[in-house]
Swiss-Prot record:
CDD domains: KOW_RPL26. It holds the Pfam family ribosomal_L24. This is Large ribosomal subunit protein uL24. Belongs to the universal ribosomal protein uL24 family. The gene is rplX.
Length: 104
């Protein structure tokens, strides 16, 4: 079970200065990288392809951020929070370390 999943709200804690402290929703998790909506945008140069109907040009898209550079956002406290795991009745779940509340 991963500490950060798709749909979680996270805060960027390290990396480029323009991204630090920003908050966003996780769009995808791939290996050790997360893609966060609207954060860490890069310019990608796209070649035109008339067969697929793709226009060429410069396109903005989100790049991945290493999973160690983000922390889960706790809406109850309004701060970032660590994630722990517990097993109750044979079911493993995530919880916030500061409040002890269950995440999912």
């Amino acid at each position: 079970m991963k500490r950060i999943k798709k749909g979680d709200e996270v805060i960027v804690i390290a990396g480029r200065s323009e991204n630090k402290g920003k908050r966003g929703k996780v769009v995808a998790v791939k290996d050790d990288t997360v893609i966060i909506e609207g954060i860490n945008q890069v310019s990608k140069h796209v070649r035109p392809n008339p067969q697929l109907g793709i226009e060429g040009g410069i396109v903005k898209k989100e790049a991945g951020i290493h999973i160690s550079n983000v922390m889960l956002f706790n809406a109850e406290t309004g701060k970032r929070d660590r994630v722990g795991f517990k097993i109750e009745d044979g079911v493993k779940f995530r919880y916030y370390k500061s409040t002890g509340k269950r995440i999912d």
